[in-house]
């Protein structure tokens, strides 16, 4: 059979015609679908703007809080429970509803914005065990200003929630994370130290903060180290907390006895510490003692973690040490510290925070019992120092708590302080 006759036979065959038509329709639909996909990709690439924020970014928590204010019509929600402490000391529970993982739409500044919250169950945070998350914002147009506005609004909202409070950070892995909820700022005058001590430290640290150019012009590293030493319970940590509130700084708590802390991790943590923060190394004597003592008894005075003594020294004042940093160290036993750790450059100001003086006792009495005659405070201080020459502010405060509304009882029962 000639080929032309074969083609005519197929053409006249109704089954073949129907099959060919189906193939043609299927091909056309497949091409249309592919074209629509390519068109959608091109449209999203050239006419839409996308912002992805991973969970480890600091703005992630800000944006989730911001979404609770702008997604009131969302029906699929997750809950975050927090505890709020009032000025009176009463604690109440607060529930915040945030969009659950999935797609949501919000109306913002005259345009619809698609919010996609993703949760990857295959990846978890090794420190907390929570799944890895990210949130993606998508909007029509190519103007990034809408995302800048969202981030600025979220940041302002977060700062508003932290206004008048001190934020605590703790080291988790290779980053700093907020520790608990922001605390009310403690007034600086609520911590009564020896006369003039608080003023000296505040004056020194304010001069440092206000004069970065002075350090730069003279080629001096722009960092400052402080050491507060003295008996326990005398107000070293309390003063640093109050000082952070006075300066409107946060506090970064770093434990040198952490078994996972290494030289590299310490260097990294100091280099990425949040802006406007005080890095606090408490009880440094517990981590590293004098090298002379270590030679005498290497097992007893061996460092608890992987952090080496030379690594700590280099992190505080080495080639790789960071600038624009304020470090506070505290210890109960300064004689146990290696001289290399507290030399100038690593520790610029050392202050002894000791037992209560006569002036401190009168000031504490007047603060706890305002309106009482100054002579009563003087009488209290004299009798306390006669009863004992070594008494810490923590002991005095605990004693005052027994006589909250009874100043005369506090004066007449001093013998119990012995």
UniProtKB/Swiss-Prot annotation:
Q: Does the keyword section mention Magnesium?
A: no
The record gives the membrane topology as: Single-pass membrane protein
Q: Name one Pfam family in it.
A: AAA
Q: Which superkingdom does the taxonomy of this entry point to? A: Eukaryota
User: What does the record give under GO molecular function?
Assistant: ATP binding; ATP hydrolysis activity; mitochondrial protein-transporting ATPase activity
Knockout phenotype, as recorded, reads: Mice show phenotypes similar to the human GRACILE syndrome caused by defects in respiratory in mitochondrial respiratory chain complex III assembly. After three weeks of age, mice develop growth failure, hepatic glycogen depletion, steatosis, fibrosis, and cirrhosis, as well as tubulopathy, lactacidosis and short lifespan.
> For this UniProt entry, which segments traverse the membrane?
16-32
Which cell locations does it reside in?
Mitochondrion inner membrane
Give GO terms for biological process: mitochondrial cytochrome c oxidase assembly; mitochondrial respiratory chain complex I assembly; mitochondrial respiratory chain complex III assembly
EC class: hydrolase
Give residues where Phosphotyrosine occurs: 181
Mitochondrial intermembrane face residues: 2-15
Q: Per the record's keyword annotation, is Translocase included, yes or no? A: no
Q: Which SMART domains match?
A: AAA, BCS1_N
**Coiled-coil segments:** none
Q: Which family does it belong to?
A: Belongs to the AAA ATPase family. BCS1 subfamily.
Role according to the record = Chaperone necessary for the incorporation of Rieske iron-sulfur protein UQCRFS1 into the mitochondrial respiratory chain complex III. Plays an important role in the maintenance of mitochondrial tubular networks, respiratory chain assembly and formation of the LETM1 complex.
Protein's name according to its UniProt entry? Mitochondrial chaperone BCS1
According to its UniProt entry, this protein's organism is: Mus musculus
Upper classification of the source organism reads: Eukaryota, Metazoa, Chordata, Craniata, Vertebrata
**Which gene name belongs to this protein?**
Bcs1l
């Amino acid at each position: 059979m000639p080929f032309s006759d074969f083609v005519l036979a197929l053409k006249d065959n109704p089954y073949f015609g129907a099959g060919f038509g189906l193939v043609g329709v299927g091909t056309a639909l497949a091409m249309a679908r592919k074209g629509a996909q390519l068109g959608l990709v091109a449209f999203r690439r050239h006419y839409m703007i996308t912002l992805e924020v991973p969970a480890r970014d600091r703005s992630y928590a800000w944006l989730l809080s911001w979404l609770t204010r702008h997604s009131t019509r969302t029906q699929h929600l997750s809950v975050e429970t927090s505890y709020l402490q009032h000025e009176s000391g009463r604690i109440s529970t607060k529930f915040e509803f945030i969009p659950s993982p999935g797609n949501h739409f919000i109306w913002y500044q005259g345009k619809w914005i698609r919010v996609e919250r993703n949760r990857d169950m295959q990846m978890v945070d090794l420190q907390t065990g929570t799944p890895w998350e990210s949130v993606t914002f998508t909007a029509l147009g190519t103007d990034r200003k809408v995302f800048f506005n969202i981030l600025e609004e979220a940041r302002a909202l977060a700062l508003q929630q932290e206004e008048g409070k001190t934020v605590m950070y703790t080291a988790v892995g290779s980053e700093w994370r907020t520790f608990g909820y922001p605390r009310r700022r403690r007034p600086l005058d609520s911590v009564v130290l020896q006369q003039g001590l608080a003023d000296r430290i505040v004056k020194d640290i304010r001069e440092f903060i206000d004069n970065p150019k002075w350090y730069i012009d003279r080629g001096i590293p722009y960092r400052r180290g402080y050491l507060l030493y003295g008996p326990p319970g005398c107000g070293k940590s309390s003063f640093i907390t109050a000082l952070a509130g006075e300066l409107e700084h946060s506090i970064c708590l770093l434990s040198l006895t952490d078994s996972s802390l290494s030289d590299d991790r310490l260097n990294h943590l100091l280099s990425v510490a949040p802006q406007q923060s005080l890095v606090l190394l408490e009880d440094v004597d517990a981590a590293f003692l004098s090298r002379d003592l270590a030679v005498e008894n290497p097992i007893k005075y061996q460092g608890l973690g992987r952090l080496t003594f030379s690594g700590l020294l280099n992190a505080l004042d080495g080639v790789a040490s960071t600038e624009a940093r304020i470090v506070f160290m505290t210890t109960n036993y300064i004689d146990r510290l290696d001289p290399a750790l507290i030399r100038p450059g690593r520790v610029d100001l050392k202050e002894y925070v000791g037992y209560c003086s006569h002036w401190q006792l009168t000031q504490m009495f007047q603060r706890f019992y305002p309106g009482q005659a100054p002579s009563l405070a003087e009488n209290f201080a004299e009798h306390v120092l006669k009863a004992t020459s070594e008494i810490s502010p923590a002991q005095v405060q605990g004693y005052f708590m027994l006589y909250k509304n009874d100043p005369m009882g506090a004066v007449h029962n001093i013998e119990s302080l012995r």
